[in-house]
Curated annotation (Swiss-Prot):
It comes from Pseudomonas putida (strain ATCC 47054 / DSM 6125 / CFBP 8728 / NCIMB 11950 / KT2440). The gene is rplJ. PANTHER family: 39S RIBOSOMAL PROTEIN L10, MITOCHONDRIAL. This is Large ribosomal subunit protein uL10. It comes from the Bacteria. GO terms for cellular component: large ribosomal subunit. Disulfide bonds: none annotated. Forms part of the ribosomal stalk, playing a central role in the interaction of the ribosome with GTP-bound translation factors. One of its GO terms (molecular function) is large ribosomal subunit rRNA binding. The keyword Chloroplast does not apply. Belongs to the universal ribosomal protein uL10 family. Keywords: Ribonucleoprotein, Ribosomal protein, RNA-binding, rRNA-binding.
Amino acid sequence: MAIKLEDKKAIVAEVNEAAKVALSAVVADARGVTVSAMTGLRKEAREAGVYVRVVRNTLLKRAVEGTEFSILNDAFKGPTLIAFSNEHPGAAARLFKEFAKGQDKFEIKAAAFDGNFIAANQIDVLATLPTRDEAIARLMSVIQGATSKLARTLAAIRDQKEATAA
C-alpha cells in the first residue's frame, strides 16, 4: 500500500520527536506475532511510558538521523518495530524481553542507550537497569547498613571501656 508523501513526512516527524526525547530505543522483528498480542504489547507500552511504532525502514532511518539512535541504522532490516523509552532507560528493553518470552517469533534485533549500540544478546544489561526508585532504595539500604554498623561498633567500644574501667 502506497503512502502519500505528506503522510510519510508526518510519520518521520512523529518518530523524530519521539527519538529526541527518548532515553533509549529497542528494535525488534514482530513477524508472525498475532494482532491481539501486538495490541496487548501496545497497551503495556502505554502503561510503561514507552512509545511503540511499526515503521518502514527508510522512514525510520530518516527519523533517527541526527539523533543518538542513528547507530541503529544497521538493525533496520526486515519488518521493524521500534520502541522508545521516555521515563526509564530500561523500560522498552524490559517490555520487549518479557513479551518475547511468550512469543516464539518475536525477535529483538538491537538497542541503543546513551549513544551506545547494544546487541540483541546483551539486551539484559539494559533490561535489568534499576528504576530511579529502586536505585534510591538500594542506596538508602547501603547507607542504613553502614550507619547501623558504625553504631554497633561505637556501642562495643563503649562497653569495652566500661568493662576495663570496672
